[in-house]
Swiss-Prot record:
Species this chain originates from: Guillardia theta (Cryptophyte)
Alphabetized Pfam families for the sequence: Ribosomal_L31 (PF01197)
NCBIfam families: L31, PRK00019.1, PRK00528.1
Record-given protein name: Large ribosomal subunit protein bL31c
Biological role stated in the UniProt entry: Binds the 23S rRNA.
Gene: rpl31
InterPro entries from the UniProt entry: Ribosomal_bL28/bL31-like_sf, Ribosomal_bL31, Ribosomal_bL31_A, Ribosomal_bL31_sf
Cellular compartment(s): Plastid, Chloroplast
Record keywords, A-Z: Chloroplast, Plastid, Ribonucleoprotein, Ribosomal protein, RNA-binding, rRNA-binding
GO terms of biological process kind: translation
Family matches, as HAMAP family: Ribosomal_bL31_1 (MF_00501)
Family: Belongs to the bacterial ribosomal protein bL31 family. Type A subfamily.
Assembly with partners or alone: Part of the 50S ribosomal subunit.
Length: 72
């Protein structure tokens, strides 16, 4: 006898949001998904170069190893 209620609930129309804006609908085990980056705003696909440093990782690395940024 197989176990009952083993598989998660499947949402065929799960909504994907990026910055509060509806991006697409997909099938998922969650009814809503929130993403930070998707192909519409990723630099590889858009051709733009921008640096996402949400936690100050670059500055922390520079301080840790005593490096200074030279803008010249």
């Amino acid at each position: 006898m197989p176990k009952q209620n083993l598989h998660p609930k499947w949402y065929a129309e799960a909504k994907v949001y990026c910055d509060g804006q509806l991006i697409m609908t997909i099938g998922s085990t969650k009814s809503e998904l929130n993403v930070d980056i998707w192909s519409g705003n990723h630099p590889f696909y858009t051709g733009s170069q921008k640096m996402l440093d949400t936690e100050g990782r670059v500055e922390r690395f520079m301080r840790k190893y005593g490096l200074k940024e030279n803008n010249s």
